[in-house]
Amino acid sequence: MKTFSDRWRQLDWDDIRLRINGKTAADVERALNASQLTRDDMMALLSPAASGYLEQLAQRAQRLTRQRFGNTVSFYVPLYLSNLCANDCTYCGFSMSNRIKRKTLDEADIARESAAIREMGFEHLLLVTGEHQAKVGMDYFRRHLPALREQFSSLQMEVQPLAETEYAELKQLGLDGVMVYQETYHEATYARHHLKGKKQDFFWRLETPDRLGRAGIDKIGLGALIGLSDNWRVDSYMVAEHLLWLQQHYWQSRYSVSFPRLRPCTGGIEPASIMDERQLVQTICAFRLLAPEIELSLSTRESPWFRDRVIPLAINNVSAFSKTQPGGYADNHPELEQFSPHDDRRPEAVAAALTAQGLQPVWKDWDSYLGRASQRL
């Protein structure tokens, strides 16, 4: 059974780097005028040569976004269930080597968090944990997903990679989507930053979206942690390759791409490569031209000033007032957090800023009487 690993083995990191850096202004102009991007076009739009075409790139990305999604921007919020982790990663505040207080939410904790989140108006929930299969694994998810499903319109997860059969079971329990970020597609760099635990297995993580597709999960989220490798352009191109593979082989699923830049955290590292804000806009808009139909997400890792200016261009899914520690909404303890968010505005403030620009915040985009995909299938 083929997976993206087979395609990944055909891709040479250094060759891609040279090809991206070798793109010219003529290549960029050709890509901007293409009705459907080729892989070469995507390289051109990620290249240094495209930096002088940012306005044209943003204008086309905005047109495509409005054509596909209108003026709507969906809101979601992460609910951190646990900061227990059995991995040792150099860049994460939850890393097992960090001496921080550990907490896993029980049924009462989850009820308090859910009430606080619903009071703010959120209906789309992203469940996040550290990666600890023994204590925050399938038994934990089986206990708590049904109650959360009853309260929220959409449930997605960002947890440790699971088996195909486990994803199929979670789908029956009401799971709509899974976000799984490769962190970096450069295998040697990946090994340097994942020192202990199951996350050391590069290919188990790389093939997770294939397992999600085979399990019939409705939405699959991809991304690289920008700044972990020494070349964000190549990592971003690898995300594009991954997306194209999945769309070809699991066309029934929907896809999203996120653009997390390395943020400060307990015991964290400095970025190996710096993507500035103009380059982040360039990358976001390139993905919109590559895949006009997918969801592009921007989290509270970015500043309020930046988010208010970039969301109207190509973003159609945003978080707001994110707390990156378990219990953060009902009882805030910053010392437990995974990383420090940059945009700490309340959701109504973010919504007001977008409304002032003619956008329509969407808190809920379906109702229970319509059924869920897992029920209909």
UniProtKB/Swiss-Prot annotation:
Pfam families: BATS, Radical_SAM. Disulfide bonds: none annotated. Pathway: Cofactor biosynthesis; thiamine diphosphate biosynthesis. It catalyses: L-tyrosine + S-adenosyl-L-methionine + NADPH = 2-iminoacetate + 4-methylphenol + 5'-deoxyadenosine + L-methionine + NADP(+). Its EC number is 4.1.99.19. GO terms for molecular function: 2-iminoacetate synthase activity; 4 iron, 4 sulfur cluster binding; iron ion binding. One of its GO terms (biological process) is thiamine biosynthetic process. Transmembrane segments: none annotated. Residues 71-301 form the Radical SAM core domain. Keywords: 4Fe-4S, Iron, Iron-sulfur, Lyase, Metal-binding, NADP, S-adenosyl-L-methionine, Thiamine biosynthesis. Binds 1 [4Fe-4S] cluster per subunit. The cluster is coordinated with 3 cysteines and an exchangeable S-adenosyl-L-methionine. It comes from the Bacteria. It is an enzyme of class 4 (lyase). The keyword Endoplasmic reticulum does not apply. Belongs to the radical SAM superfamily. ThiH family. The product 2-iminoacetate hydrates in vitro to yield glyoxylate and ammonium. Catalyzes the radical-mediated cleavage of tyrosine to 2-iminoacetate and 4-cresol. NCBIfam families: thiH (TIGR02351). This is 2-iminoacetate synthase. It comes from Escherichia coli (strain K12).
